Amino acid sequence: MDLNFDLYMTDVVNQARNEIEEAGYEQLTSADEVDSVLKQEGTSLVMVNSVCGCAGGIARPAATHALHYDKLPDRLVTVFAGQDKEATQRARDYFEGYAPSSPSFALIKDGKVTEMIERHQIEGHDVMNVITQLQNLFDNYCVEK
């Protein structure tokens, strides 16, 4: 593999990580970290991050702007598909009934998936549409902060 490509991809991945972390999402990079968060009582929004265009152009901006709302999950976390493979696989173990998809969002309540917003509900949609989908999840499963 070309060194310039590797450096470029490292930069792209780091930018994607920083963007979602700056929005307030905690990076989970191991299966143990995923279990310690998702087994807790309450609600957790999991963003399955990726380097694809719809993650950077739609999913991450929606993940950021959806938080300007009265009802929010107790915890905001992210795993990175293709990068933190162990953490991503463990998170997907919680997404029972849903096929692997990235980018995507899962709302976990008391250790169980309630609903997901899958890639096909993100790709080809505008940011506002995904924000609305996220805030609908918050309305259905979260309490006012």
Swiss-Prot record:
Family statement drawn from the similarity comment of this UniProt entry: Belongs to the bacilliredoxin family.
PANTHER family with a match to the protein in the record: BACILLIREDOXIN BRXB, UPF0403 PROTEIN YQIW-RELATED
GO biological process, one term: cell redox homeostasis
Coiled-coil ranges per UniProt: none
Species assigned in the record: Staphylococcus saprophyticus subsp. saprophyticus (strain ATCC 15305 / DSM 20229 / NCIMB 8711 / NCTC 7292 / S-41)
Protein's UniProt name: Bacilliredoxin SSP1241
Matching Pfam families: Disulph_isomer
